[in-house]
Each structure stands twice: as C-alpha cells, then as structure tokens.
Amino acid sequence: MGIPDSGGAEEILKLVGLENTGKKKAKNFSLGMKQRLGIAVALAGSPDFLVLDEPVNGLDPQGIIEIRELILKLNKEKQITFLISSHILDELSRLATHYGFIDGGRIVREISAEDLEKSCRKCVRAQVSSTKALAKV
C-alpha cells in the first residue's frame, strides 16, 4: 500500500486541516492535531469505514468541535462510515445515526438515534381515580 505520490498526502493533510504545519514534528503537535494526524494516516488507504476509539477524549472544547466537524465532513464529502466508541454521550448525539450498547464485550442493544431520543424523553404519567380531586391540587 502507501500513497503513490505526494499530492495525495497533501490532499489528505488539507482535508484534516494540517496542511500548514510546515516541518513541525508530530511530537510537538497539540492533542487535537495528533488526533487529526491519526485520522489522516487512516485516510491514506481510502477507507469506506473507520473505527475511532474515544476520538475527543482529552481535547479542549475547540478541539472537540474541530474533530466533530472533521468527522461530519468526511462522512458527507467522502461517504465514510464511522464506528465511534465513546463515553461522551452528548458528543455522540451530535454525530450518530445509530447506537450500539456493549456489555461484557458483546453488543446488547442496537437502536436508531431517533428511537433512542424518544426513549430518553422525560415524562411523567399519572393515573388518578378522581379528576375532581386532581383539579384541586
């Protein structure tokens, strides 16, 4: 495998927002830049599917936004499907169309984002024997 020409590498670096790093060594990159570099390396093989393990873990709020926008951009422009493992459910809710829940190394439930949202709505259901008494409450 590999990249046949440097133009491909430049295109990938531009895609992930690392085109202007010059000769800066990766060890001197910020955590967000390292996350984007990891995604760039994975993109070198032109995948249709990428697995990301805690891609925003440890990032500052701006870094989280940048990684989220990159994932959405790659999904939309390159039609790449992502499998993301994360404990940050709020962030997943901004990205995911489907969820899988794992317990003991096994998927115990799969659900669409729409169905998950419906099942998580807060509501109270009350049943009363006397609506007149309830009206006085």
What is each model feature region?
Residues 1-84, 89-103, 107-109:
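ABC transporter nucleotide-binding domains
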Residues 58-59, 70, 114, 126-128:
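Short, charged/polar low-complexity linear motifs in solvent-exposed/disordered segments
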Residues 129-137:
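Short amphipathic alpha-helix segments
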Residues 82, 114-115, 131-132:
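Short C-terminal domain-edge/linker segments immediately following a structured domain
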Residues 106-127:
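Conserved beta-strand-loop-alpha-helix hinge in the C-terminal portion
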